[in-house]
Regions:
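Interface amphipathic segments
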Residues: 1-339
């Protein structure tokens, strides 16, 4: 990579305010100014971000430090470190830190970000740890991925005691007919593992509303260890009306172990299958899907009963499906029967 100009200038004003100006039209332009020590700058920033958590233990730094910053980020510098990420023009980050008061404000905006085959348009991310209404706020106008598209994504967060509470809303699907209203939280348990819990939320898919954690209990959560290589899904439960239920639970450990179970209870087939032209599937599903992996050995098992099974309104009867895969998932034994 070739950069035409790169200039960094550090000066002090009459009141001992440090001013660091960076000017490179290919990399980054802007400034940071305030009363801060360069050797403590990393710890100062980490303390500011960590202040969102009330149980964060800050690094020791000198008192009286404060800083404001405003930078315009150009795509070439992003390409150097992350070749698969592309920032749009007029991407900027600005904010200020007052360390002694624990005050941290940040605003990041970009017209678009392309990353690993995914496209995000009109990103606006804000942090204000002293705001009584929200601590973090994120909006994304459009998200395009290879698997699912999203628009009007909004996420807001506030902190209570040692827990971050989030509310997010967005629409998804090929025609954006699916809607999501999710409430969740993040905290740490006594073992210093991350806990991501789902509070009562709802998802509308194919015109049907599913309620997550209808009972508002504390069991709907995922626990992640500090090295991010062990995940425990205690349970995630979705209900439609009073009868239908989908339940997920299991464990994952790096790439060598998985034990996942997906349960269906009186679930209408047409509510969970993707829309396919000229194909209309109906019936009620009961049963489980299991995937067990130990090292490179897999033991997938599926046992499903679909009552009143029909295709394009042609009733076929009650369908029973049993599937067992071999150890490397190269072959599957399928046993099905219609009565």
């Amino acid at each position: 990579y070739y950069f035409e100009d790169f200039k960094i200038e550090s000066t002090f004003s009459e009141d001992s305010t440090r001013i660091i100006e960076i000017n490179s039209p290919d990399i980054i332009t802007g400034y940071m100014k305030g009363k801060f020590k360069v050797r403590e700058l990393g710890r100062l920033v980490r303390n500011s971000i960590g202040s969102i958590y009330t149980n964060y233990k800050p690094f020791e730094i000198s008192g009286g430090q404060e800083m404001s910053f405003n930078f315009k980020i150009y795509n070439k510098i992003v390409e150097v470190f992350f070749p698969q990420i592309d920032f749009g023009p007029n991407t900027f980050i600005r904010g200020n830190i007052i360390a002694d008061e624990g005050d941290f404000k940040l605003n990041f905006k970009s017209p678009y970000i392309s990353a690993y085959g995914n496209e995000l348009d009109s990103i606006d991310f804000r942090i204000d740890n002293k705001n009584p209404l929200f601590n973090t706020y994120l909006t994304v106008q459009d998200v395009s991925t290879r698997y699912y598209d999203v628009k009007d994504f909004n996420l807001i967060n506030t902190t209570l005691n040692d827990t971050l509470f989030f509310r997010t809303e967005f629409k998804g699907g090929s025609d954006y007919d699916d809607s999501y209203n999710l409430n969740f939280y993040h905290t740490f348990n006594p073992g210093n593992k991350s806990v991501i819990g789902l509070k009562k939320s709802d998802i509308s898919f194919k015109g049907n509303t599913w309620v997550i954690n209808r009972e508002s209990n504390s069991q709907n959560k995922v626990i992640v260890n500090s090295t991010l290589d062990s995940i425990t899904i205690e349970e995630i439960v979705m209900n439609n009306n009073n009868r239908e239920q989908i339940r997920l639970k299991g464990q994952l450990a790096d790439s060598t172990y998985k034990d996942l179970e997906l349960q269906f209870k009186i679930v209408s087939l047409n509510k969970i299958t993707p829309a396919i032209d000229s194909l209309n599937l109906k019936g009620e599903i009961n049963g489980t899907l299991n995937v067990l992996q130990k090292d490179n050995i897999y033991l997938p098992v599926c046992n499903l009963d679909i009552s009143q099974f029909s295709v394009n309104d042609i009733e076929l009867g009650d369908l029973t499906i049993g599937v067992v895969g071999n150890r490397d998932l190269s072959e599957f034994s399928v046993n099905s029967q219609i009565k």
